[in-house]
């Protein structure tokens, strides 16, 4: 059992390292009132997939290369293939600002992620991830820019911010690769309760437990401000503002002589008096036609942001 709060407990049913870049976890949350399980499951799934932050390579400078359609002397892969391999490298670490990793390898050699030199706070999850093959005695030299963020960012997002000699990479910042959930009824209860079964797979940079902790904290922070909102002050302010508007005289609308005289004839002196009339009521006033209604409506909205009743 991972924890129990207000009678609701979360239990890890299964945890398994499938390989260095995939960790599986299965959790049960119970008891939940009828209908709550799908609400909790859907909210957790969305946050797990989109908001849990990750660390990844966002751009690279390759010595002697100035665009992605080039080839590197002595290297089997072209630049596009190298960028794709770099995109798949899984990193982890507490990155507070952009960091730079460096790679310099002389061939013949098979180049892997474990040969990249990163700052101490960044770790390569799988040092055996393939990057390229150098067939001759040539060098492959790179600088790699690393960021921490969430979600998925396309090349276009970084291209304007990156130096011209850095090649941007489509970046995946999502440590959680997949989330499934389903709901089961708790049958041995007189009251309708449910249990939520949650399964998730991470890329190895975070454990499933860490991912759930982060997602839960994120949801709490999202909803917590709603607990202290004071709607009474806002309602009071709106009421006072409306009262002040109603006290204004219709002279402030700067109406045409025809529309103004028609309203004064039926003793409409203030905005409050005018708002007592619907559009249909105004059309019944003698000599007050559709054009006058449109004029009054536009003036009311432009001056005070209010509309006539239909």
UniProtKB/Swiss-Prot annotation:
Chief subcellular location: plastid
Keywords: Chloroplast, DNA-directed RNA polymerase, Nucleotidyltransferase, Plastid, Transcription, Transferase
InterPro entries for the chain: DNA-dir_RNA_pol_insert, DNA-dir_RNA_pol_RpoA/D/Rpb3, DNA-dir_RpoA, RBP11-like, RNAP_asu_C, RNApol_insert_sf
Pfam families from the UniProt entry: RNA_pol_A_bac, RNA_pol_A_CTD, RNA_pol_L
Residue ranges of coiled coil: none
SMART domains from the UniProt entry: RPOLD
BP GO annotations: DNA-templated transcription
Entry keyword GTP-binding: no
Entry EC number(s): 2.7.7.6
Region (Alpha C-terminal domain (alpha-CTD)): 242-310
Any one cellular-component term (Gene Ontology): DNA-directed RNA polymerase complex
Subcellular location(s) of the protein: Plastid, Chloroplast
Enzyme class: transferase
Molecular-function annotations in GO: DNA binding; DNA-directed RNA polymerase activity; protein dimerization activity
Oligomer and partners: In plastids the minimal PEP RNA polymerase catalytic core is composed of four subunits: alpha, beta, beta', and beta''. When a (nuclear-encoded) sigma factor is associated with the core the holoenzyme is formed, which can initiate transcription.
Family as reported in the entry's similarity comment: Belongs to the RNA polymerase alpha chain family.
Protein name: DNA-directed RNA polymerase subunit alpha
Gene coding for it: rpoA
């Amino acid at each position: 059992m991972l924890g129990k709060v207000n009678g609701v407990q979360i239990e890890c049913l299964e945890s398994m390292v499938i390989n260095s870049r995939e960790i599986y976890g299965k959790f049960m949350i119970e008891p939940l009132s009828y209908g709550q399980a799908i609400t909790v499951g859907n909210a957790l799934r969305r946050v797990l997939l989109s908001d849990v932050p990750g660390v990844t390579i966002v751009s690279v400078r390759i010595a002697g290369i100035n665009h992605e359609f080039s080839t590197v002397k002595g290297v089997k892969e072209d630049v596009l293939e190298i960028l794709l391999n770099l995109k798949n490298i899984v990193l982890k670490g507490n990155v507070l600002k952009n960091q730079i990793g460096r790679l310099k390898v002389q061939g013949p050699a098979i180049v892997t992620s474990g040969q990249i030199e990163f700052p101490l706070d960044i770790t390569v999850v799988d040092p055996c991830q393939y990057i390229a093959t150098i067939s001759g005695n040539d060098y492959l030299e790179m600088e790699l820019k690393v960021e921490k963020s969430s979600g998925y960012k396309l090349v276009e997002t970084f291209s304007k911010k990156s130096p011209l000699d850095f090649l941007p990479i489509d970046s995946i910042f999502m440590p959680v690769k997949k989330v499934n959930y389903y709901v089961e009824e708790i049958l041995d209860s007189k009251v309708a309760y449910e249990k939520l079964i949650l399964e998730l797979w991470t890329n190895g940079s975070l454990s499933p437990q860490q991912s759930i902790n982060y997602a839960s904290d994120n949801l709490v922070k999202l909803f917590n401000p709603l607990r202290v909102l004071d709607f009474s002050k806002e309602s009071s302010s709106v009421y006072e503002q409306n009262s002040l508007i109603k006290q204004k005289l219709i002279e402030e609308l700067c109406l045409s002589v025809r529309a103004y005289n028609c309203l004064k004839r039926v003793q409409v002196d203030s905005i409050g008096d005018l708002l007592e009339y619907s559009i249909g009521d105004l059309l019944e006033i003698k000599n007050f036609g559709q054009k006058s209604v449109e004029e009054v409506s536009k003036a009311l909205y432009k001056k005070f942001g209010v509309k006539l009743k239909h």
